[in-house]
């Protein structure tokens, strides 16, 4: 019971720190299991990971928030991402998704994205869900 409270308290502190240091307006991360490693300044999320921000929803098997680098590294089989904006709709998937503090997104490994009746497949797709700008690297 004591460990459960420590995880909840640590997660609460993580949430406060995430919202105070990053320009991401609203990021909500849910998972079945959370581990906070204070000395590494990392928070790990396992099983049924769902990440919601102002612009995107991401589903995956696991995620790690690195406070030093201000990036969330998301892994899945595959991980999936979709927009929350009607005027800039897209959906995609990749083995790994890197979600940066400015909400720029990298889809890495067997990456694909669909938007405006266009499909892109590449090993690396970089895009900004705010502006819709997309680049890829084959």
Set out the residue ranges of the language-model regions.
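Sec-dependent N-terminal signal peptides
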Residues: 5-14
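N-terminal amphipathic/hydrophobic interface segments
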Residues: 18-138
């Amino acid at each position: 019971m004591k460990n459960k409270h420590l995880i909840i308290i640590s997660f609460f502190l993580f949430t406060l720190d995430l919202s105070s240091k990053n320009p991401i307006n609203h990021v909500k991360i849910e998972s079945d299991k959370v581990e906070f490693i204070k000395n590494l300044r990392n928070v790990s999320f396992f099983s049924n990971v769902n990440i919601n921000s102002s612009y995107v929803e991401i589903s995956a098997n696991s995620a790690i928030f690195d406070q030093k680098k201000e990036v969330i590294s998301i892994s899945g089989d595959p991980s999936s991402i979709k927009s929350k904006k009607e005027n800039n709709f897209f959906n995609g998937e990749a083995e790994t998704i890197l979600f940066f503090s400015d909400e720029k997104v990298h889809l890495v490994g067997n990456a694909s994205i669909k938007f405006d009746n266009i499909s892109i497949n590449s090993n690396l797709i970089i895009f900004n869900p705010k502006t819709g700008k997309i680049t890829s690297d084959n």
